């Protein structure tokens, strides 16, 4: 599932407005209904960011892989809860009813699934847990970063990735200033962890200057990465991969400049192009 956005495509210092397909990212709250001591209990078990579609397969696989069930016969039914919501008119809550009562590990159901290295919000157990703790928009007057620095950012990031050079299997985030100087870089198998490490280090050591710096990330930019950047008042976030729909919508809402598909030959601007100096 995807949605089209108007995007400023930058190449050779020229801007072209094009329609760009962006993968939809939406939260799915998963609930479990089961019988305990003769009573029907309902438990929120997790929330995950997903591309809508095949949600029944998703909860089946989740229950099996977490060994909440041993086989698919233990699932009596799966149903969507509530009315379709949001911009895409989607069901974002799904509930599985199981007939398993013996040896059901309730503690496993209640634990926070924070170990998923690709999605930090997957540990949340309610849609109410996903919110942006920010009220005001970013100052649109800064930072101002030249096109040439943005184009160099993937190589600047790669040059600082010592672990990636060894393993090829790790993400990174870098804080880069307006002159193209890499202030700091942090790596992790989880892209959200890499950004947390970077912001933790730079804020703790007084290295963050939001008026003259931006953040470059490996991989795609999703909702959570943009959310983390917003909490640190980062004006520009650039990724070598594609953003998701929630990332674009969130960036637009708070006036962040969001860049995707950044490479030496060009990049896409998904929101607030005014911070980028072309030419």
Q: Can you name each region flagged by the protein language model?
A:
Residues 93-107, 185-193, 230-240:
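Short, Lys/Arg-enriched charge-dense amphipathic segments
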Residues 192-269, 275-278:
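Feature captures the catalytic cores and cofactor-binding loops of soluble hydro-lyases/lyases
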Residues 1-173, 177-178, 182-184:
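Intrinsically disordered, low-complexity regions enriched in acidic/Ser/Thr/Pro/Gln residues
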Residues 163-215:
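Glycine- and Gly-Pro-enriched alpha-helical subdomains that act as flexible
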Residues 58-63, 73, 108-111, 136-137, ...:
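Surface-exposed beta-strand edges and their flanking turn/coil or helix-capping segments
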Residues 176-177, 270-272:
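Short beta-strand-to-turn element immediately C-terminal to the catalytic PLP-Schiff-base lysine
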